[in-house]
Structures are given as structure tokens and as C-alpha cells.
């Protein structure tokens, strides 16, 4: 388990390194937030939760259009120094496929560039999750909200989305020549 978790951590770091390298941006103060895992140091299984030791910076995703919250953990012992790992579902994945429509999903994703809005990730649509207000109002015992990030791009890997790719400006090997295109891409969001 520990080896797999170390591999996953390095994988996240490598993806960030590639993104930062290609965009010419820097990662001022990177941090990791892992959910649904076994904390082998503390021997705690965190299902639906993240580590939230006092002072730890954590990221709590809400849903795609609402974006994530960056928080500072409070280390609440009554919660095993854990915090929720996200908004939580209002309905099961199966129910989401039965009840939600692509039209609703597309409408909710307005303003977020995503080449992968298709029926496959319909179960990840914002309507399947609790509202940001509910999370903001209940997170207090475990974490203090520092800020909320505004999403501009979303990619959901599915078995059939090989044609879903970011703009060419995000994929070239010589990214420096595409900075004006990238700036235009981000400024338009």
C-alpha cells in the first residue's frame, strides 16, 4: 500500500512539473492532498476524508464549476484530524446516469473549457454533488477556508475520450513560443 501511495505522489509531482515547465509558471508552494487512502504512519483509513492535522494546507474539491477550496486544517481530534475530501454526492453514480441530462451538464459547465463533456462522465456533473454553500457552512470544525479557486479547464479521463485534448498551445514541446496564445486562452476564461 505504501509503495503504491508513494508512486501516486510522484506521479502527481511529475504531472505538475510538466505543466509548470510547459507554461513557464512556477509552483510557489506546492502541497499534496490525498483522499481515500490508508495513512500508514497514523494507521488511519481515510475513506471520504483527507488528513487535516493542525496547520496543514489542504484542498477540498467541491464540483467542477464551483472549483476547490484551499484550507488550513484545524487538527480536530474528534474527527481523527481529518476533513471531508469533497462535496459529497447527492445521488449515486447510477442515479446520476438515470436522472441527469447532458443539457443540464453543459449548462452547468458554461465558462469552463472542457473538451470532454459527454455522457461518460455525466455522473461527475455538478448536479450530482452537494452545493458549495452546504460544504462552506459545515467545514468549520475541521478546516478554515483560505480561498476558493476558479476552474478554467477540466479534463476527465474516460476509456473513449482519446480525442479530448487541450488546445495545441498547451501541448507543444516549445511552450515558450505559445505564451501569447496561452495568455489569451486564460484571459478569455
Question: Model-predicted segments: where are they?
Answer:
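Domain-length cofactor-binding catalytic modules of enzymes
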Residues: 1-189
Amino acid at each position: 500500500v505504501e509503495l503504491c501511495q508513494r508512486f501516486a505522489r510522484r506521479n502527481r509531482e511529475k504531472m505538475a512539473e510538466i505543466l509548470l515547465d510547459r507554461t513557464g509558471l512556477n509552483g510557489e508552494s506546492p502541497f499534496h492532498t490525498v483522499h481515500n487512502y490508508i495513512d500508514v504512519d497514523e494507521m488511519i483509513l481515510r475513506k471520504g476524508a483527507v488528513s487535516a492535522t493542525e496547520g496543514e494546507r489542504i484542498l477540498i474539491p467541491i464540483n467542477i464549476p464551483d472549483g476547490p477550496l484551499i484550507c488550513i486544517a484545524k487538527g480536530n481530534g474528534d474527527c481523527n484530524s481529518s476533513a471531508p475530501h469533497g462535496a459529497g454526492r447527492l445521488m449515486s453514480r447510477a442515479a446520476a446516469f438515470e436522472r441527469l441530462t447532458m443539457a443540464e451538464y453543459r449548462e452547468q459547465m458554461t465558462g469552463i473549457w472542457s473538451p470532454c463533456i459527454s455522457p461518460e462522465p455525466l455522473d461527475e456533473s455538478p448536479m450530482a454533488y452537494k452545493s458549495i454553500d452546504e460544504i462552506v457552512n459545515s467545514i468549520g470544525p475541521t478546516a478554515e477556508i483560505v480561498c476558493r479557486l476558479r476552474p478554467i479547464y477540466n479534463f476527465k479521463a474516460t476509456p473513449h475520450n482519446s480525442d479530448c485534448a487541450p488546445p495545441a498551445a498547451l501541448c507543444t514541446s516549445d511552450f515558450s513560443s505559445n505564451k501569447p496564445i496561452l495568455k489569451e486562452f486564460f484571459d478569455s476564461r
